[in-house]
Amino acid sequence: MARARRVKRDSATNIYRTCKQAGTCPPDVINKVESTTIADKILQYGSAGVFFGGLGISTGKGTGGTTGYVPLGEGPAVRVGGAPTIIRPALVPDTIGPSDIIPVDTLDPVEPTTSSIVPLTDSTGPDLLPGEVETIAEVHPGPSRPPTDTPVTTSTGGSSAILEVAPEPTPPSRVRVTRTQYHNPSFQVITESTPTTGESSLADNILVTSGSGGQTIGGATPELIELQELPSRYSFEIEEPTPPRRTSTPLQRIQTAIRRRGGLTNRRLVQQVSVENPLFLTRPSRLVQFQFDNPAFEEEVTQIFEQDIEDFNEPPDRDFLDVQRLGRPQYSETPAGYLRVSRLGQRRTIRTRSGAQIGSQVHFYRDLSSINTEDPIELQLLGQHSGDATIVQGPVESTFVDINVDENPLSEDFSAHSDDLLLDEANEDFSGSQLVVGNRRSTSSYTVPRFETTRSGSYYAQDTKGYYVAYPEDRDISMDIIYPTPELPVVIIHTYDTSGDFYLHPSLHKRLKRKRKYL
């Protein structure tokens, strides 16, 4: 007797929808849908005395609540029945309301019998002119002095009188030299120059020299010592630290760098993939799927790529196959001292029956090359400075010819006003010729550039291949085929073939003998 085939029953939810109205639902379906099972009743009765918080313990799927499961010994504890903490402001709040009301004076009402005519009063304006000023002057005469008689001495000697007149002392003159300079950040004036004897211009130092020669007054000549040149205020040196700095901020968080590096470089959990495509730095999404560039979108954030698992699309780069999530860029330093740009990706290789996608984590990275340090060069300040300027212009150089202007070379043969000077003699100098390089079979033409200049003409020819001399004559290059004697097979050799190979006649091929196997 054949066993009847077992048919799987429909889900409890669908059965409950159809049998609830008819009242033919099985007890297990009602208990499961209406949550009246033994486990549900235990939780309902036990929740009256025990509070489990948001752990989400029930007959449903175990998700651990909204925040997931927390390992033991980690995370904050759950406070049962605690009062919430009220956060009060540190400052005393001010009451917000209307400002102080200013009282307004009211005017007395005007009676109806009051006249509306305003009487005018006569008044004089203020006097703006000054008044009379009283002048009082008192004169006090000085004391009177009696006249004095001055004796006059007269000498009758024969000598002349000599009067010594001393000039009035001249006060010393003080000379003050000032200079005013306005600071302009976009313009800098260099006031240094090379002064000459008796002349100074735009210099802070003034040298006064006298004639050569002289005598030394005093002891012996002092000993000459070596002097050091004082540097200018515009010259300075930048001291480089030893060893040179490798980052702009010397403070480095070692623990954070080690923790971040350990998570990405763990080869047991994360696959390591080195990317050589430069699009990984600017447009990494173009390595995962074909798409159009959006200038308004910045790819400095985590990107998620949605793709149907049934449709297989080949990515532009095979290293980014089945990539569903590509993280933001992370920068780190390699042991060799290079800068590394990393992105953590998630593949979707396997898909379960419930719809979940499972895949491994991939660490995509690219190491940037180092920047070689070059020798520093001396820079000059831009501004005004005094000095000699030399201007050299090659195309306009002049050529001096020593001729005698008194002699007329045209006066020996004919008159300088003869019509023979108007005749144009054609000189074949091949100035407009074209150079053809090549043989008769393959002729290549090269365009020679011609530059307009006041100097003599210069021509340039390409010197990258061998030269072929083309003679202006005809040659018969056709060669007759030399046939061998009738005893030998015919071998045709193509003489115009320059490859050095030949075609063998089919009759010259070696015949293969058929081997028969006898039983």
From Swiss-Prot:
Give the UniProt entry's GO cellular component terms.
host cell; host cell endosome; host cell Golgi apparatus; host cell nucleus; viral capsid
**InterPro entries membership:** Late_L2
- Intracellular or extracellular location(s): Virion; Host nucleus; Host early endosome; Host Golgi apparatus
UniProt keywords, alphabetically: Capsid protein, Cytoplasmic inwards viral transport, Disulfide bond, DNA-binding, Host endosome, Host Golgi apparatus, Host nucleus, Host-virus interaction, Late protein, Microtubular inwards viral transport, Phosphoprotein, Viral penetration into host nucleus, Virion, Virus entry into host cell
Supply one GO BP term.
Answer: microtubule-dependent intracellular transport of viral material towards nucleus
PTM per Swiss-Prot/TrEMBL: Highly phosphorylated.
Q: Where is the composition biased (Polar residues)?
A: 150-159
Q: List cystine links.
A: 19-25
| Span list, region Disordered | 137-175
According to the lineage, what is the superkingdom? Viruses
Chain span(s) of sequence motif Nuclear localization signal: 1-10, 510-518
For this UniProt entry, the molecular function terms from Gene Ontology, in alphabetical order, are: DNA binding; structural molecule activity
Family (UniProt)? Belongs to the papillomaviridae L2 protein family.
Subunit structure of this entry? Interacts with major capsid protein L1. Interacts with E2; this interaction inhibits E2 transcriptional activity but not the DNA replication function E2. Interacts with host GADD45GIP1. Interacts with host HSPA8; this interaction is required for L2 nuclear translocation. Interacts with host importins KPNB2 and KPNB3. Forms a complex with importin alpha2-beta1 heterodimers via interaction with the importin alpha2 adapter. Interacts with host DYNLT1; this interaction is essential for virus intracellular transport during entry.
Give the function comment from the record.
Minor protein of the capsid that localizes along the inner surface of the virion, within the central cavities beneath the L1 pentamers. Plays a role in capsid stabilization through interaction with the major capsid protein L1. Once the virion enters the host cell, L2 escorts the genomic DNA into the nucleus by promoting escape from the endosomal compartments and traffic through the host Golgi network.
Q: What is this protein called?
A: Minor capsid protein L2
Q: Which organism is it from?
A: Human papillomavirus 14
